[in-house]
Amino acid sequence: MYQADEKRYETMKYHRCGASGLMLPELSLGLWHNFGDTGVYENMKQMCFTAFDNGITHFDLANNYGPQPGSAEKNFGKILREEFSAYRDELIVSTKAGYDMWPGPYGNWGSRKYLKIGRAHV
């Protein structure tokens, strides 16, 4: 299992997010094109390790990130479960909803059913 750098918070600057009190790093790691099923899983893990070791605690996803829509969330979820579980309380994971995911009336645009079904596989 991954061991984070003990000095990971020494060089990154953090700022409050609005009036929420949440502290976010100056840099985040966006997982749009780098974490789909066409990518190399070991490279995905190393990107996450390097980011976290340098104080990046915010990972940005969306339900249509891939390629193959949804695959970035799936792959990052695997990394989170297998490698980052000891650090889960130090991470901010954001996502978005509302993009086309599958055919039919419930596969797009953020309906209540879409959001409930979409969470089931993550």
Where are each of the predicted segments found?
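Conserved small/polar residues in nucleotide/adenosyl-binding loops
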Residues: 120-122
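N-terminal binding-site loop/beta-alpha segment at the start of enzyme catalytic domains
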Residues: 1-92, 117
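Structural motif corresponding to the early beta-alpha repeats
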Residues: 83-113
